[in-house]
């Protein structure tokens, strides 16, 4: 099964998990780059990113077109912003909704607090599916590296391999 991980990462947590998963399951990766610049520090980060997420913005991407035809499974990864999917991933999902519905899908969310469950539910709704084949929630995985985090990533990978 050929797998692609499509993800957005602002501070590196989602990038860290995506690369760990890619190594474990032998997946290709595609990091989404937004043309909109998001603040990465302080209160402005939460204000601008949260507002953008709540308003369900779909910023233009610099990442170029992503061809999903050769992939059987797509894993979507994102940071949680105000209990929502980060806007750049929302853009990708809306642009590829029909293609994604025909794939085996998994998703993971990285968060500093809470809201990942709601964000994953909203992502399923945006795609138009009932469930992901695998779901993972990771709390600041890059900053809080531990055996528990490693075990959670490994468990997610095992679920993906079972798809």
Regions found by a protein language model. Name each.
Residues 76-77, 107:
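Redox-cofactor binding/interface segments in oxidoreductases and associated redox assembly factors
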Residues 1-76, 83-85, 90-95, 101, ...:
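N-terminal beta1-alpha1-beta2 submodule of the flavodoxin-like/Rossmannoid cofactor-binding fold
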Residues 85, 116-120, 149:
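Conserved donor sugar-nucleotide recognition element shared by glycan-biosynthetic enzymes
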Residues 106-141:
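Short, glycine-/small-residue-rich phosphate/pyrophosphate-handling segment
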Residues 89-104, 134-146:
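Short flexible/disordered coil segments
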Residues 132-163:
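Glycine-rich phosphate/pyrophosphate-binding loop and the adjoining helix
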């Amino acid at each position: 099964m050929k797998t692609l991980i499509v993800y957005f990462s602002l501070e590196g947590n989602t990038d860290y998990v995506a690369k760990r998963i890619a190594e474990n399951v032998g997946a290709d990766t595609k990091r989404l780059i937004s043309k909109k610049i998001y603040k990465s520090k302080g209160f402005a980060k939460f204000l601008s990113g949260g507002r953008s997420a709540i308003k369900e913005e779909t910023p233009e991407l610099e990442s170029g077109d992503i061809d999903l035809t050769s992939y059987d499974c797509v894993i979507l990864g994102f940071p949680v912003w105000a209990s929502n999917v980060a806007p750049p991933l929302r853009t990708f999902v809306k642009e590829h909704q029909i293609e994604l519905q025909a794939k085996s899908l998994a998703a993971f969310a990285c968060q500093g607090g809470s809201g990942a469950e709601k964000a994953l539910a909203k992502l399923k709704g945006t795609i138009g599916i009932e469930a992901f084949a695998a779901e993972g929630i990771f709390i600041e995985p890059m900053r809080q590296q531990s055996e528990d985090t490693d075990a959670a990533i490994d468990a997610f990978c095992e679920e993906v391999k079972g798809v």
